[in-house]
């Protein structure tokens, strides 16, 4: 609690907690303030326990032998621990250290969330940061998170030596952009305004059905 008090008092905008060089959690000032208020009279404990036995076949298929961790946050007071499962609208940034296996494309690496019954959610806005050697994502709750991989589909034959190959695979695997055919992406072809706006909309999670009319004739 004293550490949180000091961080908030000094208006520390970002605070990073590293656990065994395997998991890092970055906490912003607003979240620090919330945790500071919640820790009155006690302490806040952050844990990242490695998960060796995944709960379901779905989770095993998604994560395979890649790392998975049970992230938890508890309030400790008087020897009693109370789980904090949600951040009430705030988020934290998480890094899961990982070195891609031979043949894995970094654009197809994801963070995956595994719920209490073993159902998997692929976190679309996660990504692999080569400079950090980690999969990075944001979340507002604590549970089991791991590193997942989706095989490239479709298999574009014209991007192997392209400078943006990993970025193309990232965008295609998350459904932001599609190829010009089942096997080609045409990476040097210009992007229309419609393609650009569509990709931005998909990235933002917009439902096109909510918009009955559009101002651009080339946006579909």
Spans of model-derived segments:
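Feature responds to low-complexity, polar/acidic, surface-exposed segments characteristic
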Residues: 140-165, 173-197, 201-220
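Generic cytosolic/nucleocytoplasmic N-terminal low-complexity/intrinsically disordered segments
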Residues: 10, 32, 48-49, 118, ...
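Proteolytic processing hotspots in large secreted/extracellular or virion-associated proteins
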Residues: 1-117
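Proteolytic cleavage junctions
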Residues: 68, 75-174
């Amino acid at each position: 609690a004293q550490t949180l008090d000091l961080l908030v008092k000094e208006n520390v905008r970002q605070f990073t907690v590293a656990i065994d060089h395997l998991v890092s959690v970055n906490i912003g000032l607003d979240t620090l303030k919330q945790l500071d208020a919640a820790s009155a009279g006690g302490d806040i404990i952050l844990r990242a326990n490695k998960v060796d036995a995944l709960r379901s076949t779905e989770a095993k298929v998604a994560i395979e032998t890649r790392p998975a961790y049970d992230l938890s946050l508890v309030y400790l007071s008087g020897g009693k621990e109370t789980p904090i499962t949600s951040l009430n609208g705030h988020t934290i940034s998480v890094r899961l250290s990982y070195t891609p296996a031979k043949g894995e494309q970094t654009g197809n690496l994801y963070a995956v969330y595994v719920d209490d019954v073993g159902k998997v959610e692929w976190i679309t806005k996660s990504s692999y940061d080569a400079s950090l050697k980690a999969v990075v994502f944001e979340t507002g709750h604590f549970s089991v998170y791991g590193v997942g991989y989706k095989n490239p589909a479709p298999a574009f034959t014209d991007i192997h030596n392209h400078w943006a190959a990993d970025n193309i695979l990232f965008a295609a695997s998350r459904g932001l952009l599609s190829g010009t055919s089942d096997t080609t992406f045409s990476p040097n072809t210009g992007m229309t305004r419609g393609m650009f706006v569509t990709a931005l909309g998909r990235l933002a999670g917009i439902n096109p059905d909510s918009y009955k009319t559009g101002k651009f004739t080339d946006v579909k």
